[in-house]
Amino acid sequence: MGFKKNIFVVAAAAVAGAFGNGCDGNTYKQGAILYTNFCANCHMETGEGLRGLIPPLAKSDYLAAHRADLACLIRNGQRGKIVVNGVEYNQQEMLGIKKLSDFEITNVLNYISTSWENNAPIWTVDEVRAGLEKCK
């Protein structure tokens, strides 16, 4: 009986790890890894950006106001003036990340959208693809 119980516990833990939040509570682990590798150098690990130079992603009003443009922004970059949380940014060009797949962009957007007190709706790959169609 003890052996069967142990097998059940191990199997349940494996299923939870594969489909659930995992032990760290981070549902968007791939998005977090991609963010760290491609975005955090400028936007910082905390999503706060660099005051006056690089806009924050944490608690950002820009994310909701420009949702339809975000997939293109990640793929192709951003140039020119933008206003985030009432502060104008116009000094640093954000380079696009052309090598990210549609799925990876979706994961990055879901990570950003649910981190640092951002509470945006979850992105789907179809929504990202529709956004990317607009900027081809």
Model features per residue range: what roles?
Residues 54-58, 79-135:
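Axial heme c-ligation environment in periplasmic c-type cytochrome domains
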Residues 24-50, 64-76:
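Sequence/structural segment immediately N-terminal to covalent heme-attachment motifs in c-type
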Residues 10, 25-26, 42-44, 80-85, ...:
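Short hydrophobic/aromatic-rich motifs at helix boundaries and adjacent loops
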Residues 61:
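Active-site catalytic pocket residues across diverse enzymes, especially alpha/beta-hydrolases
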Residues 16, 32-35, 128:
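Residue-level signal for mature regions of secreted extracellular proteins and peptides
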Residues 1-10:
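Bacterial N-terminal signal peptides that target proteins for export
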Residues 9-17:
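Hydrophobic alpha-helical targeting segments used for export or membrane insertion
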Residues 19-22:
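C-terminal motif of bacterial Sec signal peptides marking the signal peptidase cleavage site
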